[in-house]
Amino acid sequence: GYLGGYAAPAYAGYAAPAYAGYAAPAYAAPVAAVAHAAPAVAVAHAPVPSSAANTYRISQTARLAYAAPAVAHAPLAYAAPAVAHAPLGYAAPAYGVARYAAAAPALGYGYGAYGYAAPALGYGHALVH
């Protein structure tokens, strides 16, 4: 992976199509992704009451999360805490990644079924060669 703080396009920049419907842009800086992770986490853990006030708050949080391409491009990010917690280095069972690869640090995932290695912000934890 690049050590300059950007995801390598061939590895961490794009999600495997079979598991994620949307690809994360390769140009997203990891620092920006982590900084914008809070809205996605907030949406994933937000209560779902019927009050108009909370509905508005959740919709506003979702709007902010969608502004962070590296975190919020996948619709499942709002339903699955494991996806919203990607900056913490968890695998995303909602995408089926956990069946093929262990969790990679930070934003990188290893898609074992495809033979990709996840640089994960330059740490270079190659899961499959």
From Swiss-Prot:
Cystine pairs: none
Chain positions of Sequence repeats: 7-10, 15-18, 23-26, 28-31, 37-40, 67-70, 79-82, 91-94, 103-106, 117-120
Keywords: Cuticle, Repeat
Protein origin, superkingdom: Eukaryota
A GO molecular-function annotation: structural constituent of cuticle
Tagged with keyword Repeat: yes
Function recorded in the entry: Component of the cuticle of migratory locust which contains more than 100 different structural proteins.
Domain notes: The tetrapeptide (A-A-P-[AV]) repeats found throughout the protein are also present in many proteins constituting the protective envelope of other species.
Protein name, UniProt field: Cuticle protein 12.5
The species this protein was found in: Locusta migratoria (Migratory locust)
